[in-house]
A protein has these predicted regions:
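Conserved, structured core segments of small domains
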Residues: 1-95
């Protein structure tokens, strides 16, 4: 499993102009089975994505994000192996 931390590198007006395209891109990632969860950081300085699959697949997906194409965000990918969880999140183990 991967934790992706997005940090905006442009004003929010630039982010907002691409937001609808970014949401479509997220929907495609969920449909492909790569994305598990996503959302904004608070304060609104970027976002966080939980993903699964192979790192190369994830990197290719991230490269197609409209935020990446427009160079308005940077991405930090952390691979994570959940060894313990709350019972309601057991499904995240062994991903």
């Amino acid at each position: 499993m991967f934790i992706v931390s997005l940090s905006y590198t442009a004003p929010l007006s630039d982010i907002d102009a691409l937001l609808d395209q970014h949401i479509v891109w997220l929907q495609q990632g969920y449909a492909a089975g790569l994305l598990l969860a996503s959302g904004r950081k608070s304060p609104r300085t970027g976002g966080v994505i939980l993903a699964r699959g192979e790192r190369a697949e994830l990197e290719a997906l991230l490269a197609r994000d409209p935020f990446a194409v427009a160079n308005v965000a940077r991405y930090e990918i952390t691979e994570f192996h959940a060894s313990m969880s709350a019972p309601e999140l057991d499904c995240l183990r062994n991903i």
